[in-house]
Structures are given as C-alpha cells and as structure tokens.
Amino acid sequence: MDSAKVAYDFSGCRVLVTGGSSGIGAGIARAFLRAEADVAITGTRPSASDYDRDLSAYGYHQLRMTDADAIRRVADSLEGLDVLVNNAGENLPGGRNEWEPDVFEESVAINLFGAFRMSAACKQKLAASALEGGASIINLASMSSFFAVPIVPGYGAAKAGVVQMTKNLAAAWAPDGIRVNAVAPGLVESNMTALMQGVEALEKPYLDRTPMGRWGTPEDVAPAVLFLASSAARFITGQTLPVDGGYSVA
C-alpha cells in the first residue's frame, strides 16, 4: 500500500529505527528508505538474513532494549545520526503476565528505559546534525499511554512514561538543536496485535470505538513520523500525535 501522496526528501539523512525489522518499525524504515534516507534498523535476531524479508537495504544491528551496553555499542557504531525513531517495544514479554512485578518491571525496562537509554546514547551525534529543521527523536507512544488496558499494566505505564519523557527531553535538548516528539498509534496491524485480528470478542470493542472503523496499518503511521522528522515540523517539539482513526476523541 502507498503510504501517502506527500513526498519527503531525506537525501543524505541518517536514520536509526529501533525495532525496524517488523511491524510499525518496518513501515517507518521503508518510508524513510523511499525518501532516500540512509536507514539503519535494529532487531533481536543475530543478523538481517535471519528474517523472512529482505533487509539488505538497511544497516542492521542486533539489539535487545534491556541491554544497556548493547545500546551504547549501537549508538557508538553510527558515523552520524540525524533522526532517531524509538520504536522497539514489546508487551506481555515472553507471553508472561504483566501483573507479576518482575514482568511489569521488564516491560517498563523494554518500553521506557530502553528508549531513554538510546536517546541519551545518541544525543551527541544528534546534536552534531546539520539536518534542516533540526535533528529529531520520534518516540512511539500508544493509546495505552492515555487509556487503561488492564491486560498490559506494565506496557501501559511505560507508554504513559514515554509521553512525559518526550516532553522533558524536548525541553532539555532544544538548545542542542534536537526536537523530540512522539506518535501514539491506535489499533494497528502488527505482530504485537496479531492474536487480536479477526477475533471479534477482542477487536470489536476497539473497532466500535474507532470512528474510522478499521484497523490501522504501519503505512498509516509512517507518514506522521516522516512529517515530525521533516523541516515542515521545525517549530514542533514535545508533542504526541495520535494516529488512531479517532479512537482518542470518541
């Protein structure tokens, strides 16, 4: 599916998309690649060849977001960076119950601490960027940043934290020429939501509340990320943009 009729030119722009090997992250990485950016991605498998899709167009780094040393190594390996997309995330880690304190803690470590560590590790390279409109960090929030989803209390707490982290990084790093924003997807087709798709009891309450009445796709989310990273958004920072088919206003 064509992501949008709006064309962005990111020629020469260096982009890192964490979790860019699948789902929303893969859609974002593809969109930057089509816009002529130099795109690196992370994934949990040892190499790009371990995936069932062709990732040869990207620089690939194996990374788990709970590994602080690996986060630093990935950041240090980059020659330069203009845009960081903190997309990597996981709910119900390993299929376990997030109401168990250890699992809750792991979910927060993956979805909040990992994004903060990666942002901090990349700060100096982003501050050195000459990208028109300034360097950007785009965080992935969620509807669970704002609404209760009782099955994933750790994930929801982490994603709520992402919204506030976005504001604080934006305020603190604006003098360094770094803009920090977030997008908050609604119900989007991905590996994370695969078990819900087509199961009426699970998806119907969300679709009934979504005015646009359908699942979103990674191609719905990617254009919002490219906009926030572009010079068209040069005076926008600290904001979280819902990309949810109207779920948050219904």
Protein language model regions, located:
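Short C-terminal tail/terminal secondary-structure segment
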Residues: 2-6, 147, 226, 237-250
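Conserved glycine-rich cofactor-binding loop
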Residues: 21-22
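Active-site loop-to-helix junction immediately N-terminal to the catalytic Tyr of the SDR YXXXK motif
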Residues: 99, 148-156, 168
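Active-site helix of classical SDR
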Residues: 119, 158, 166
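Residue(s) in the substrate-gating loop at a strand-loop-helix junction
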Residues: 142
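Short, small/polar-rich loop/turn modules that mediate ligand/substrate recognition or access, typified
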Residues: 174, 179, 236-238
